[in-house]
């Protein structure tokens, strides 16, 4: 039942009925009898619990007159705000009143000031230097995701300059890797699709530095051009993924943890 509650938790907190159905379907597909499993969503739709009973043979207790009996197993999965993630992309977005399905600019082009902040750097267009400065490191991290953990409160250096060619190559690669049918959209997407970007939500932290306030997920849609036209846009998602959960700021990206 551990895997069943983890499967169901993917739909919390927004769709508790579907969470129960997903957990039941997963349990039944793995040999649990329907009449021997009970499921419950609780904690303001942020937790799901399963209890399953199974008939087992008692080998060593037979000398006491017990041949078989019911063994119960329970599991609980909890969802909460992500406070640390792996695989983030080197783009930073400042806090908005994020709305599901709305399009946001994750990197601007030269001459566009949607997210530029003079407190950070006049030459900053939204890119982050997660492993150090340089276009090659930036492109690798944008293409494949950062191979390390980021957490709320971390101070990050920004990657100055427009770096349009590395940005376009990386996003084009991610979009080409979406081989799902139908093509992933905000209403119907695979949770492992490369078009999904884990993006740090940031605030200024001094010259050429920013501080992580939380994390958000976006479905990347386009990187239309180069130079002044090289911007990255994505639609905001509310979803559950793997990662450390806690009491930090929530921006729609939640993690799941097995707590029992």
What are these regions (language model features)?
Residues 17, 24, 40-47, 67-260:
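N-linked glycosylation sequons
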